[in-house]
């Protein structure tokens, strides 16, 4: 590729594709997971690049992925709706696609929520030289920011199957550095929702919705105390009492996490409120940064013994995470129980994404 010709610097994979005679813009024929996708119809930023770099694909390359390729969408349509426009595939449609033999799962993806003023939408093409792709080169990432506006942020995407996977365990934080927004040094936090047993999560820290006296007698608090062993309750007793909305840490005992952050969401046996839940979430995030944590599991504060409405708690907690300016923290997992809780937190994250795009 010649820089003098004014073309963007492509990644090494895209360069090999060009050398082999393939096209990085014409349906991503050289990439088995992307064959047959009309990328330009769903990713304007990628279309803007591929329009100037596309060349006819070599005859040998499309055959590599012919057996696994999804049929290309017609011009101006999306496979999810078949109608004109850029409507996102529904979750049900994505799961149906994953169940079909021979269908590539990269078409059905979910965008993880991210903090900040803007997060990108669904991007099913995912080629290496797409500025919305997590594999995009820094040069093309800069180009993508200029195409999408000054508040462009790159969000990681994951397959629909992985997003909806019901699991009692999850991996710890990856060693990658945090992404930053153009024009500042504010890090993003990945937001995830999992139906999971918080006591089994292999993260840097998990949270406990506690009372001000740190007596872990019921609900999630009791489960954490049992899993952590007697040392956890002993440390809690030494640090009690704490004020409403405050947070303190203890070791995690026999659990795989390093710390348990206890956030006081109510008095012993008493109700809670939206202000307390917001303050407790913010205090938990600050404590995680103080401890140098990169990954954190949050439980639904105040929705058990506290009796606070689930949808309201999800909205308040997600909002508090979005407003937080992290130090070391890169990943927040909402560990919930039941489909209703998963829907509530997923909807709160999606609502934040929609608001950020407006």
Swiss-Prot record:
Cited Gene3D superfamilies: Leucine Aminopeptidase, subunit E, domain 1
Q: Which Pfam families match?
A: Macro
What InterPro entries is this protein classified in? Macro_dom, Macro_dom-like
| Domain (Macro): residue spans on this chain | 178-353
**Superkingdom of the source species:** Bacteria
**What segments bear the compositional bias annotation Low complexity?**
70-88
Region Disordered: what ranges? 70-93
What is the protein named?
Uncharacterized protein Mb1934c
Q: Which organism is it from?
A: Mycobacterium bovis (strain ATCC BAA-935 / AF2122/97)
